[in-house]
Regions:
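Interface amphipathic segments
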Residues: 1-468, 475-480, 485-599, 633-684
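Short edge-strand/loop segments of extracellular domains
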Residues: 627-633
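Short, solvent-exposed loop/turn segments enriched in Ser/Thr/Gly
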Residues: 604-606
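Short solvent-exposed strand-capping/beta-turn motif centered on an Asx-Ser/Thr pair
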Residues: 614-616
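Acidic/polar loop patches that form or flank catalytic/metal-binding clefts of enzymes
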Residues: 550, 618-622
Length: 684
């Protein structure tokens, strides 16, 4: 036998009946008993949607147990009822005074002692009316143990209570306070209760989740829960390495709808939380998660947070991530989603992350973030220009953050460095390894595009810089170092054009751009006014954009040109002073460097050439060159203050001659005599 949505293998009806025709139709009365075997719902499993929609949630074991119990109860069962029915014309009524359902699975349901169900037809508006006076109980076979008590209300409709024992399944437990409800004559049933839930989550569980519940069941069976805000509390929650302690918040229906609804469209509804604030641990480290607003949908199992802020680790120097938008979804694998407008900082590291966007996931106790970001200097004014990464990947697992990415110059896309970061949330210690495979400076990429500190110091660079560095941090202490090198670079420096610059630079404070003493730069040529070649400069980079020149040496015109020790300040646009010492300059060789073909000279010079370099270029201020008299020792000067030069009239210093062509017709006698004198001048 099959009728509507219910089928049975065998149905028996016994009893007595009376029938008599009347002017309005047929009067009939039946008193009897009905029994049916193997009752089952026809068509698809009506609870299949419940199983799928709760998968991975704390109530999943309860939903599975309930669905399995209903399925098992439908395989081998028997239903019995005693009833009486009366029909007068087109109206009728029936009263069921005893009914029970039993299954081989152990499931039982039935009317309580002295209870009855009354049916009448047609009710106002058509259809079938019903009323229960007494109780209905369920138990066994995996079904919840429950008792429903109803009574007719004087004004119509029903009122009653539902008592349900705590329902458990594989680590899940649902407890309901007595459900109080009332049903109107139109078929709408309203109810109130409170739930307390314990249940498993991936790698953890929720414990003591409590929520007052108010809802209704429509005439078509649609269930609606909590159309208004209600206080949600929980004792603890653990999801992988994410854990919360005691938490309280107001849970409101999203967009004015119900918090939860279940009907022909399946499980729907959504929640909204204003001013979210959660405190707990992530990966064993302290965690605070806050947001201006949070929303979640039960239908799509998605959620989003607006202006979310995540703090991890030591509250005094936490890992900080702030996202204007964080969206995600939950599935059997865990959580995943997208983020945008994200900013962040790790502890006290003077590096800031901004404009980050990409994808994130949380599964198997591992948080992973992949996307793009901009890295800037936390110092003001900034020491380096912003860099971008389009392949940044961050992972948090077991209280350890690891991150990798390529840092690019944003305008040209040139690779500046590859970074590899490790940070321990528990201790607050970590390090960032920087690998600079080779930054090639061209007309498109210049040093000032990477750091403003290069402005006014170097320009028109052509060459490659490569090296490695490391930044380390622990508590409030940040240290860094690195070694970088270049070979055969050309550039325009503050003291003139430079070609063939080569050397290695060892930083003792990479972030502060401080080097070890006695760094060596080899220079093929430099031209502060006169070109000199094959120089060696020893120097040290100091804090606050200071450069200490320890020495500079060049072979120069048969002698030696030395740059005296000095400290130059590049922190501001102001004149910079250097002093070059000349020892043993050969006059003839020097004239050759000036390309003066018609001049010949002999002699040796010593001296000191103080120079000032500013926006006008370089110039000598107060310099001294002394023609060394033959037979005298070199004059080695450190300054020109109170300088006194002695001269022995008996000793010569050198000769100067004009060796160019002269036209006798144009000069005349006295002109010829003058140029004859210029052909061999002695000086001292």
């Amino acid at each position: 036998v099959q009728r509507g949505d219910i089928r049975s293998a065998r149905t028996e009806l016994t009893g007595a009946f009376q029938m008599a025709p009347t002017p309005d139709g047929m009067d009939a009365r039946i008193d009897g008993a009905l029994s049916a075997n193997r009752l089952a719902m026809a068509g698809p499993d009506p609870l299949a949607g419940l199983r799928a929609s709760t998968a991975g949630s704390p109530v999943a074991p309860l939903a599975i147990r309930f669905a399995d119990a209903v399925r098992a109860a439908s395989r081998d069962n028997r239903a019995q009822a005693r009833f009486s029915m009366a029909q007068k014309g087109s109206t009728g009524s029936a009263t069921i005074t005893a009914a029970d359902f039993t299954s081989r699975s152990g499931a039982r349901a039935g009317l309580g002692q002295g209870s009855s169900v009354k049916l009448d037809w047609p009710k106002a508006g058509g259809g079938l009316g019903w009323a229960l006076n007494g109780s209905v109980t369920t138990d066994g076979g995996g079904l919840p143990r429950a008792a429903l008590r109803l009574a007719q209300r004087p004004g119509g409709g029903l009122a009653g209570q539902l008592f349900v024992d705590p329902y458990t399944a594989r680590g899940a437990r649902l407890a309901l306070e007595p459900v109080r409800f009332s049903a109107g004559a139109g078929g709408m049933t309203r109810f109130t209760t409170a739930i307390r839930l314990d249940g498993p989550l991936d790698g953890g569980a929720v414990r003591g989740l409590a929520l007052p519940v108010a809802g209704q069941v429509a005439a078509n069976g649609t269930l609606t829960v909590n159309p208004r805000c209600a206080p949600l509390t929980l004792d603890s929650l653990k999801f992988g390495s994410f854990a919360l302690g005691t938490t309280r918040m107001a849970l409101c229906p999203d967009s004015g709808n119900a918090l939860l609804a279940y009907g022909p469209q399946g499980l729907t509804g959504g929640a909204a939380i204003e001013a979210l604030r959660l405190k707990g641990t992530l990966g064993g480290s302290a965690m605070t998660l806050s947001a201006d607003a949070a929303r979640g949908s039960l239908a799509t199992r998605t959620f989003d947070l607006r202006n979310a802020l995540l703090l991890l680790g030591d509250p005094a120097a936490p890992v900080r991530l702030n996202a204007t938008m964080l969206a995600g979804k939950m599935d059997a694998k865990g959580l995943s989603g997208t983020m945008a407008g994200t900013r962040g900082r790790i502890g006290t590291i003077p590096l800031l992350v901004g404009d980050a966007a990409g994808k994130w996931s949380y599964a198997a106790s591992t948080l992973r973030v992949d996307g793009a970001l901009t890295l800037t200097d936390a110092a003001a004014p900034n020491r380096f220009e912003p860099l971008v990464s389009r392949d940044f990947a961050l992972t948090l697992r077991n209280s350890q953050i690891t991150a990798k990415g390529s840092l690019l110059e944003p305008k040209t896309g040139a690779l500046v460095a590859r970074t590899d970061i490790v940070h321990q949330l528990g201790s607050g210690k970590g390090q960032a390894d920087l690998d600079v495979p080779g930054v090639a400076f061209t007309s498109a990429l210049q040093p000032e595009m990477l750091t403003r500190l290069a402005l006014g110091v170097v320009a028109n660079a052509r060459g490659t810089v490569a090296g490695k560095g490391q930044i380390r941090w622990a508590d409030d202490t940040v240290t860094s170092d690195g070694t970088f090198h270049t070979d055969n670079m050309d550039l325009a420096a503050a003291f003139g054009p430079v070609t063939g610059l080569s050397g290695e630079l060892r930083f003792t404070d990479l972030i502060g751009l401080v080097s070890a003493p006695s760094q060596i730069a080899r220079i093929k040529t430099v031209n502060p006014g006169v070109e000199v070649t094959d120089g060696v400069v020893r120097y040290q980079l100091l804090a606050n954009q200071q450069v200490r020149v320890e020495s500079g040496e060049w072979p120069f015109a048969g002698g030696q040109l030395s740059l005296l020790p000095t400290t130059m300040d590049f922190s501001a646009d102001k004149p910079r002073n250097m002093a070059f010492r000349v020892v043993g300059l050969d006059a003839g060789a020097f004239i050759q460097t000036l390309d003066l073909d018609n001049i010949s000279a002999t002699g040796t010079y010593d001296g000191l050439l103080p120079m000032v370099f500013d926006e006008k270029g370089g110039r000598i201020v107060g310099g001294v060159l002394v023609a060394r008299q033959i037979g005298r020792a070199p004059l080695v000067l450190a300054n020109t203050e109170s300088l006194s030069i002695t001269c022995d009239p008996a000793l010569q210093s050198g000769t100067l001659a004009y060796v160019g062509p002269v036209s006798n017709e144009q000069l005349g006698v006295f002109g010829k005599m003058a140029f004859d004198a210029l052909k061999h001048l002695q000086y001292k």
